């Protein structure tokens, strides 16, 4: 199992230092997200000073950028990292695409993302092999690529494309044509086994691929410490985050996979602005299903037991204050996960 560092929202120029620290702790990969900053600029800083790490976006929002724009950014990062870049894409939701990015939302995110990836790969094929650019789909059309705008071939042209999603359609799309899939941190083993993996495997089989062709990646809610008191403190922060996700109708299917019926109550509380009361509505047993609860000395094995071969890469959505302040213990946990 590989272990990845997720760069928190911060200025791109600080990513180099963060990457060096991540490498020193033994992390395998360095992932960025599109939140308060562009997801690509931190990687340009980090890749220069941490040549032993893999890099990826988790995720970059696809639809506000054209496939050709995204293709060029990924191509340049694949060149800079010498093939150690993984392009992670997400669809976001209508409100963000339309109101935050002022872009069009066609209402068919999975079919649109399929075309988006096909169009990007057509651009890369044109640059690498000289294939005339000709892509025609329902949402995207590309037919112009002159030598002046062609960056030319690179050593590692097969840029891995990962997508993120919650529901069955994007899980299936990953199985059909992607190199990897970012499992949303708000998940349970039941949801992986009943929704994500079956849909992914079915689509992979229909496309003459296998589940092994899709690397599954996720971040984990970690609730840990050296004592019961420290673990309970760690739970409190996770409980608040879980209450937020559970209140969002988009994630309701995760609750349904475990027969949990308290999602609508949280939604109603959020609409009333009762944010400070929502965490108390999350039952204790739910925390152990959406995250990992274990003392530090057995944390790595507990994560391995939870995921088995369900995922191949993990990161830490939360660590708890005890582990965050103990680099030696964190380094050991990372090493144990990798062994």
Residue ranges and their predicted role:
Residues 1-339:
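Active-site-adjacent structural elements that line small-molecule/cofactor binding pockets in enzymes
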């Amino acid at each position: 199992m590989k272990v990845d560092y997720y760069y928190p929202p911060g200025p791109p120029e600080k990513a180099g230092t963060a990457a060096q620290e991540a490498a020193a702790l033994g992390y395998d990969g360095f992932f960025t997200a599109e939140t308060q900053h562009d997801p690509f600029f931190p990687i340009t800083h980090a890749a220069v000073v941490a040549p032993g790490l893999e890099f990826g976006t988790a995720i970059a929002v696809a639809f506000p950028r054209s496939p050709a724009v995204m293709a060029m950014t990924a191509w340049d990062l694949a060149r800079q990292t010498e093939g150690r870049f993984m392009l992670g894409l997400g669809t976001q939701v209508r409100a963000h695409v339309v109101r935050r990015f002022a872009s069009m939302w066609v209402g068919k995110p999975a079919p649109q993302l399929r075309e988006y990836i096909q169009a990007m790969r057509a651009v890369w094929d044109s640059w690498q092999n000289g294939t005339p650019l000709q892509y025609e789909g329902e949402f995207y059309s590309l037919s112009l690529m002159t030598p002046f705008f062609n960056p030319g071939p690179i050593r590692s042209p097969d840029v891995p494309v990962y997508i993120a999603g919650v529901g069955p359609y994007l899980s299936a799309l990953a199985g059909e044509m992607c190199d990897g899939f970012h499992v949303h941190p708000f998940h349970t083993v039941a949801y992986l086994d009943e929704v994500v993996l079956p849909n992914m495997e079915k689509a992979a089989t229909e496309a003459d691929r296998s589940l092994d062709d899709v690397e599954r990646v996720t971040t984990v809610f970690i609730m840990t410490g050296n004592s019961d008191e420290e673990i309970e403190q760690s739970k409190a922060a996770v409980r608040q985050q879980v209450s937020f996700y559970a209140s969002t109708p988009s994630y309701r299917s995760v609750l349904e996979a475990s027969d949990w019926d308290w999602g609508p109550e949280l939604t109603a509380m959020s609409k009333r602005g009762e944010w400070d009361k929502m965490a108390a509505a999350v039952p204790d047993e739910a925390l152990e299903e959406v995250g990992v609860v274990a003392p530090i000395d057995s944390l790595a094995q507990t994560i391995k037991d939870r995921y088995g071969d369900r995922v191949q890469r993990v990161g830490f959505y939360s660590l708890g204050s005890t582990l965050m302040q103990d680099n030696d213990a964190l380094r050991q946990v990372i090493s144990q996960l990798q062994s």
